[in-house]
């Protein structure tokens, strides 16, 4: 198994490096710390062939325990003090009955949690020069019991400083309860979200804009982003849903435009057939483009990461933790519930929704990657080792599926570093300081180490070897979405691209034209699964409205109260998502 050799971390722990990683984060927030011996033992468990649940894949966790006068045992597990978001409270009654609750910090930058000792243990919530005690498990009808019965994905406890994460059915939660809570407790409210299944047909969502003559003034183009490498730059009138400035006669292909009312967010459009011939003619790992994909509209959005934080949240159902049906299992693997040893998140709770306390800062959301069944290899060499290379993911410092070498990985560290790379075994050294990560397949483009040029990944032309999948009719050309990171002009950008009907080769050539450092596939086959929206306050000031990269995406936002309701951020969804928050 890929984590069998943990000698590097043993050396880290012996040298005190692992403890330093944790202590640095904990000291800044006055949080409890774990000793080096405990951290070493937890990492050794992390690297085991199989573990019982995702808590054991939180190697930086800190556990505090106290015994009450009645003999009950209380435990507080801070799952990653450097992230300071997720906490697990466990209570074991004197007769042995155990209960657990998954809590989320309403303000990780302010509040820290610890467990007091003595005959009447309590949660001690500290911050802003004050401290308060809370015993939400106490009483005949405890605060936690009331919160658990509320029907809310996030139910406030302890004076609203914490949320109880509740299990809900994605897109089927009690809408009235959620709507009422947001309206009363958040600046934006009265918004609901649902998931509407789309159809899967090759070219069903193909968009082709009419091309006009050259553009006029494009003064709103971001200087640092420049222009894509195209042979022609016609004006394009498209069905892109982001309102932009400076394009009354259409958007010039390959140029960038500021999105109206959204500082730090920019949009671009193009068609792969416009890409510079010097890129298209290269024999460096991409196929010739066919006539359909050459004329397929591509919509792109760029986020200036100097202005945004990135996070990642699991859906209520997807991606799953069980085995994919694609790779073959061997021997003892048939006795394992999933590739990491478990198939359920328990005792943690996946609720598929953004923490309500973050709503005032949310700027955008992007649908995540493949479902678990599609997120592993059926064919090629990668199907034959690393248990089929199931795509890994980390949320709030907890690994739900371990990161696997050879896969493209978007990651965010506890100190805010954002990266995208081909994961290697040596990169596991980063895991103690990862807050979020999502893997999805192999690279579309990477930097050539010798020339520095953006070039196609080495599996772009291999259908099975790249696990590129396709439409329901097994057509490689279909609606697809991908993302890349790019450094330009001293800035870092996350670029998301929606391709209305293309093969991986057209995606790679497009990301080359935009000079991306590393690009990866996300999801595919319908606007619902390739969803991307940016948010703004509605006219009434009591909720969010969404502008979608493609207008077709709006159809997966249901109607509620006569208006469309954005997904992910105001109601639980069964799919995972990446979100962007404006920095404070």
Q: Language model features by range: what are they?
A:
Residues 2-13:
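Bacterial N-terminal signal peptides that target proteins for export
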Residues 11-23:
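Bacterial N-terminal signal peptides
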Residues 24-28:
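Sec/Tat signal peptide C-region and signal peptidase I cleavage site
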Residues 29-399:
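Zymogen propeptides
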Residues 291-295, 401-404, 474-477, 569-572:
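A short catalytic or substrate-binding loop motif that flags glycine-/basic-rich loops and adjacent residues
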Residues 300-302, 409, 482, 577:
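Conserved hydrophobic/aromatic beta-strand scaffold that supports enzyme active sites
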Residues 314, 319-500, 504-512:
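Aspartyl protease catalytic domain
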Residues 438, 444-447, 454-458, 468-584:
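Extended C-terminal subregions enriched in glycine
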